[in-house]
């Protein structure tokens, strides 16, 4: 599906080499201050053009078509479009019938019977422009509640930071070309990416997301737990293969006496749960880790088949990220923001008191 969310519905549209990509955000309350500069800054963070990302250079200028009047949201659908200006579709002519390894070519073709071979169409990371735009709008609502979502890279290839989560440097990451959270490892991360690129290869990455200012009570029980919603959102990002919340996999190696977050004087003494208990936020920071596979588009010679079943060797052309996880950190923040904004709106009717408060009743 192309639509995400329950109360705050986000729909993306467009293809990598189509006319444009964009989104529609429906359900945003009226009266939220719309920060167009922030929206553009988020899109600029996601842009390629550096030696650590795709050479494809797009202006990615957002055009807000509806849902905003005199600087505030109107309560009606917000439509945002970003026109594609630098697509090189001819680079993909040799892939019309070919299935690229680790791409969605094979599965899209056999599911739909048709696929857009130009840059992958809807399966391209270009679609994440829409996600970042939608996430920026969601962040404008979260600001009203002082909820802050931050992401950065803590691992590239075999280089992984051993800093404690509270030691990750988000201020440094804001200035880093690769959103690196560990200043001591930035050069290693960069070299790993460049070495992969120079050898016609790619490399994976690990992204850390922290949400501060969390409220108690976001999320639902059982099938709409906050952690399941977050995992769903993050796993839907291109190239993501795993998500951890709190201690994540490490929790399976721990004793309950160590993993349990004790309370004293009304406060949690630790946060092994990552800010979620029983599928509902407990007010502590949300702690998330998202793991990206190596970009499947590599320039080394590869083997595959075409749609007729013929065995082929081929070499890709085009412009591709040597490490998709770097820009993926911006997308991770966007998806988390969309989930939290949706949960905030859902929580407004979670119990009778909340509902009465919405109408000024006691």
Swiss-Prot record:
InterPro entries documented for this protein: Chorismate_synth (IPR000453), Chorismate_synth_AroC_sf (IPR035904), Chorismate_synthase_CS (IPR020541)
One CC-aspect GO term: cytosol
Gene Ontology molecular function, alphabetical: chorismate synthase activity; FMN binding
Residues given in the record as NADP(+) binding sites: 46
Signal peptide bounds: none
Free-text comment on the cofactor: Reduced FMN (FMNH(2)).
Keyword Cell inner membrane: no
Top EC class for this record: lyase
GO BP annotation list: amino acid biosynthetic process; aromatic amino acid family biosynthetic process; chorismate biosynthetic process
Cofactor: FMNH2
Superkingdom of origin: Bacteria
Listed pathway(s): Metabolic intermediate biosynthesis; chorismate biosynthesis; chorismate from D-erythrose 4-phosphate and phosphoenolpyruvate: step 7/7
Catalysed reaction equations from the record: 5-O-(1-carboxyvinyl)-3-phosphoshikimate = chorismate + phosphate
EC number of this enzyme: 4.2.3.5
Annotated binding of FMN, by residue: 122-124, 238-239, 278, 293-297, 319
Keywords in alphabetical order: Amino-acid biosynthesis, Aromatic amino acid biosynthesis, FAD, Flavoprotein, FMN, Lyase, NADP
Job of this protein: This reaction introduces a second double bond into the aromatic ring system.
Subunit description: Homotetramer.
NCBIfam families: aroC (TIGR00033), PRK05382.1 (NF003793)
UniProt record similarity statement: Belongs to the chorismate synthase family.
Name of protein: Chorismate synthase
Organism: Campylobacter jejuni subsp. jejuni serotype O:6 (strain 81116 / NCTC 11828)
